[in-house]
Amino acid sequence: GIDIIRIFDCLNYLPNLQEAVNATNRMKKQEGRGHAQVALSYTLGDAYTLEYWADTAKKIEEMGADSICIKDMAGLLVPYKASELIKAMKENTKLPIQLHTHYTSGVAGMTYLKAVEAGVDVIDTAMSPFAMGTSQPATEVMVETFKGTPYDTGFDQNLLAEIADYFRPYRDECLKNGL
């Protein structure tokens, strides 16, 4: 089943998220499962300083969330800004932080590299047949990037290749049909 409930408001207005966090926490208490993950919509602008993100992370922790996901839907987060962002948020919260970015601007893999080095706990990837473009970086590439480092996943590249080979015909069929 699904245990991580990603809770999102496109304006990052935390009061809109409180009831969903509460409901997830009730489920966790009653059924022994459920993880309230508050997703923040990453964006640019004068209001979105490192202090804004760090303070918001602390407020999310105080809401009772289990983790935070930074959702960079437009691929705006660049590598060194990701490093600064993760460090600032980690200084203000003990919650695990997940990063979800898109390859739209072509820097997502490098952004993940710097975010991991800065202490992000989880990165979202996609198997190579579905990766890149407006999707996430390829799982296989990120696994190889971290091989032999303190961030080594231990994933088997041969198994990942089998998984990619399995899904490639489905991707090709979708492309053939204009999806």
What positions do the PLM features span?
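Catalytic cores and adjacent flexible loops of soluble metabolic enzymes
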Residues: 1-179
